[in-house]
From Swiss-Prot:
It comes from the Eukaryota. Involved in pre-mRNA splicing. Important for bud site selection. A motif (Nuclear localization signal) lies at residues 2-11. One of its GO terms (cellular component) is U2 snRNP. This is Pre-mRNA-splicing factor BUD31. Pfam families: BUD31. The gene is BUD31. Keywords: mRNA processing, mRNA splicing, Nucleus. The keyword Amino-acid biosynthesis does not apply. Belongs to the BUD31 (G10) family. GO terms for biological process: cellular bud site selection; mRNA splicing, via spliceosome. Belongs to the CWC complex (or CEF1-associated complex), a spliceosome sub-complex reminiscent of a late-stage spliceosome composed of the U2, U5 and U6 snRNAs and at least BUD13, BUD31, BRR2, CDC40, CEF1, CLF1, CUS1, CWC2, CWC15, CWC21, CWC22, CWC23, CWC24, CWC25, CWC27, ECM2, HSH155, IST3, ISY1, LEA1, MSL1, NTC20, PRP8, PRP9, PRP11, PRP19, PRP21, PRP22, PRP45, PRP46, SLU7, SMB1, SMD1, SMD2, SMD3, SMX2, SMX3, SNT309, SNU114, SPP2, SYF1, SYF2, RSE1 and YJU2. Present with 1900 molecules/cell in log phase SD medium. It comes from Saccharomyces cerevisiae (strain ATCC 204508 / S288c). InterPro entries: BUD31, BUD31/G10-rel_CS.
């Protein structure tokens, strides 16, 4: 969520009015996702967070695309958006590195989040999962990531 505006906050730089409606839509969607009633089942409680994480990802990707791909916003506006927490600075930094262009969330690359000390299964390319399943004679058992609900964010997918 963006920071709360106070008297000490700097005003938005030029160009913010052009992207404000889209950012407002994201904010409304995030509020709606937070208002949803949570389930008492452990599996269902994670799914509520998935929607919030996906909206957070989409908003950060929108700002990333505007600045790095389309070059539609100024550096001042980009820095202000990062400072006001409209986008995730660390996630955008990972997207700029090779191999992480489609990264869904930072939890999926943290090695201490898993039992065996490796990254999340959603980071494994789908072709590799299918090949290993074919060798074993089984179906691919991976459908969604437990952390964020991602269906696969390897850069080769």
């Amino acid at each position: 969520m963006p920071r709360i505006k106070t008297r000490r906050s700097k005003p938005a730089p030029d160009g913010f009015e052009k992207i404000k409606p889209t950012l407002t839509d994201f904010e409304i969607q995030l509020r709606d996702a937070q208002k949803d009633k949570s389930s008492k089942l452990a599996a269902k409680s994670n799914e509520q967070l998935w929607e919030i994480m996906q909206l957070h990802h989409q908003r950060s990707r929108y700002i990333y695309t505007l600045y790095y791909k389309r070059k539609a916003i100024s550096k001042d506006l980009y820095d202000w958006l990062i400072k006001e927490k409209y986008a995730d600075k660390l996630l955008i930094a990972k997207w700029r590195k090779t191999g992480y262009e489609k990264l869904c969330c930072l939890r999926c690359i943290q090695k201490n989040e898993t039992n065996n000390g490796s990254t999340c299964i959603c980071r494994v390319p789908r072709a590799q999962l299918e090949e290993e399943a074919r060798k074993k004679g089984t179906q691919v058992s991976f459908h969604q990531c437990v952390h964020c609900g991602c269906r696969g964010c390897a850069s080769t997918d």
